């Protein structure tokens, strides 16, 4: 399946092949659970299945966050990618900051690299991008200094895109994620949310990943992660109205239904 990432209302369903996801919905190495979740996504019309084998929950908030090796990560994600690719015609993204994991995932059928590191973790990721033609999700993940949050995010993203272009990477392959929850305080996340508009990012495809993030829990007074469904959907709809077009969601099936109904009413 060839997915146009400039299309409106693209929904990415989260499939955590982990046991320590902050949202508590990881399937671990259970292929049956993974396929059941993926089938639900596909049947509901969810556009992308995002498979990740390493928890990205912030160490500053959650205890017991341990980095996993490439081998550990591969042992989790590859069997699941194989199973999804064998059973469903759906776009798959690999959620990894490691180039060797991303490369192997691509060999097994992943279409998109979803890297939260902003190319700061693995220097070989650029080399992988040079020898493949897969889309790459560039996530802002850099400490915010003084000044407007949105301005620094845009500047940091633009610098990284310019560097990628100098390396021969076609900008048409790039999807931008403004990086809610990564290297940002609660106040900075809220400011970014309030001031977000896709025009500031030169009309690149924009992926939003606010789903169940801790800053939404703070502003809605929902410390329980399972109680953040409504605020997560409200956040995504607000950012949709500001030009975002790809939405990484834990409750992807519900969100797909909601935006489909909205389309019927317009």
Task: Please give the residue ranges for each predicted region.
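N-terminal structural segment of carbohydrate-active enzymes
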Residues: 3-14, 29-44
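Active-site-adjacent loop and "lid" segments of alpha/beta metabolic enzymes
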Residues: 21-40, 56-79, 83, 88, ...
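Structural preference for beta-strand elements that scaffold enzyme active sites
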Residues: 10-14, 47-50, 91-93, 111-112, ...
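Residue-level marker of regulatory loop/turn positions in helix-turn-helix DNA-binding domains and
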Residues: 4, 94, 224, 228
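N-terminal amphipathic alpha-helix/helix-capping segment at the start of soluble metabolic enzymes
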Residues: 1-22, 162, 167-171, 260, ...
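Active-site loop-to-helix "anion-binding N-cap" substructures in soluble metabolic enzymes
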Residues: 4, 41, 46-48, 76, ...
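Structured loop/turn residues at beta-strand edges in well-structured enzyme cores
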Residues: 6, 44, 108, 169, ...
